Amino acid sequence: MLMNIGKVDNIKIYTLAEDYAGYNSPFWSQHGLSFLIEVESNGIKKRILFDTATYAEPILFNMKLLNINPKSIDMIILSHNHFDHTGGLFGIMKEINKEIPIFAHPNIFKVSFATEPEFMLAGTLNKTLKEDIEKLGGRWVLSRDPIRLMPGIFTLGEIEDEEKINFEKKPTIGLYKLENGRVVLDNVEDEIGLAIVTEKGLIIVSGCSHPGIVSMVKKSIKISGINKVYAVIGGFHLIDADNERIVSTIKALKKLGVKKICTGHCTGFKAENMFMEEFKEDFERLHAGKIIKF
């Protein structure tokens, strides 16, 4: 699977939402993740909103501090259906108030839930909200396959089971879903990521990396044919992982040549510390308001 991808000339990533606001910071934190990715490629300039965290209000507040007008957003990517990545969508769409593509997996509207310590829905998207978003101008682009968004940028599509490396085949989260009226384990097959091609190499942006961040990086390489990986940004969902899983993840990313790690959200303090020890000055902790330039 190879795409004629192209590459971007300039990229800047604004962290609009994250669980940590940073020390002595004016920015608001919240549970979840949201990035504004500003790119320029072959004279084309776009602003891509990647995920919408749990609530719109803190995102809009942080956008105002960063002098970003919501109406300047050109497209939206929803990494997966969990509430801490989709909850702010309606409120943000009200501010965007124009026709705009929303890229996601076809299963993003599935019923997904936890049963411990009690029943709780994991996702907030449903048919009614889907239609409400459409009334505000949202145009759903639901695909299992990768999609090239512009020169140098593409979605990863679904990470199939056979594409996952062995140690990432075990789910990192205990969720269930309804499938033909039956309760089955949810492996979060609806998670997609984003890859960006730069002079320095690939940059991979993830929401929670439920399919496994290493498998997502390998999928990016497979799609693009580019073996050089510069940075991996987002949540890795290693918060409940044992040391063996974390060490395996770090070793695999190092073997793939990943230079920089920018992580937070669901990665977990233990894993973050282990990444920091290995990547040293090339490790960065995400926080609301953080701007990453390449």
From Swiss-Prot:
<dbReference type="GO" id="GO:0102041">
    <property type="term" value="F:7,8-dihydropterin-6-yl-methyl-4-(beta-D-ribofuranosyl)aminobenzene 5'-phosphate synthase"/>
</dbReference>
<dbReference type="InterPro" id="IPR036866">
    <property type="entry name" value="RibonucZ/Hydroxyglut_hydro"/>
</dbReference>
<feature type="binding site">
    <location>
        <position position="265"/>
    </location>
    <ligand>
        <name>substrate</name>
    </ligand>
</feature>
<dbReference type="InterPro" id="IPR001279">
    <property type="entry name" value="Metallo-B-lactamas"/>
</dbReference>
<comment type="function">
    <text>Catalyzes the condensation of 6-hydroxymethyl-7,8-dihydropterin pyrophosphate (DHPP) with 4-(beta-D-ribofuranosyl)-aminobenzene-5'-phosphate (beta-RFA-P) to form 7,8-dihydropterin-6-methyl-4-(beta-D-ribofuranosyl)-aminobenzene-5'-phosphate, a precursor in the biosynthesis of 5,6,7,8-tetrahydromethanopterin (H4MPT). To a lesser extent, is able to condense beta-RFA-P with another arylamine, 1-(4-aminophenyl)-1-deoxy-D-ribitol (APDR), to form 7,8-dihydropterin-6-methyl-1-(4-aminophenyl)-1-deoxy-D-ribitol. Dephosphorylated beta-RFA-P is not a substrate.</text>
</comment>
<dbReference type="GO" id="GO:0016765">
    <property type="term" value="F:transferase activity, transferring alkyl or aryl (other than methyl) groups"/>
</dbReference>
<feature type="binding site">
    <location>
        <position position="186"/>
    </location>
    <ligand>
        <name>substrate</name>
    </ligand>
</feature>
<comment type="pathway">
    <text>Cofactor biosynthesis; 5,6,7,8-tetrahydromethanopterin biosynthesis.</text>
</comment>
<keyword id="KW-0460">Magnesium</keyword>
<dbReference type="GO" id="GO:0046872">
    <property type="term" value="F:metal ion binding"/>
</dbReference>
<protein>
    <recommendedName>
        <fullName>7,8-dihydropterin-6-methyl-4-(beta-D-ribofuranosyl)-aminobenzene-5'-phosphate synthase</fullName>
        <ecNumber>2.5.1.105</ecNumber>
    </recommendedName>
</protein>
<dbReference type="GO" id="GO:0042558">
    <property type="term" value="P:pteridine-containing compound metabolic process"/>
</dbReference>
<dbReference type="GO" id="GO:1901285">
    <property type="term" value="P:5,6,7,8-tetrahydromethanopterin biosynthetic process"/>
</dbReference>
<comment type="similarity">
    <text>Belongs to the metallo-beta-lactamase superfamily.</text>
</comment>
<keyword id="KW-0808">Transferase</keyword>
<dbReference type="InterPro" id="IPR052926">
    <property type="entry name" value="Metallo-beta-lactamase_dom"/>
</dbReference>
<dbReference type="InterPro" id="IPR041712">
    <property type="entry name" value="DHPS-like_MBL-fold"/>
</dbReference>
<feature type="binding site">
    <location>
        <position position="228"/>
    </location>
    <ligand>
        <name>substrate</name>
    </ligand>
</feature>
<keyword id="KW-0479">Metal-binding</keyword>
<feature type="binding site">
    <location>
        <position position="116"/>
    </location>
    <ligand>
        <name>substrate</name>
    </ligand>
</feature>
<dbReference type="Pfam" id="PF00753">
    <property type="entry name" value="Lactamase_B"/>
</dbReference>
<dbReference type="GO" id="GO:0016740">
    <property type="term" value="F:transferase activity"/>
</dbReference>
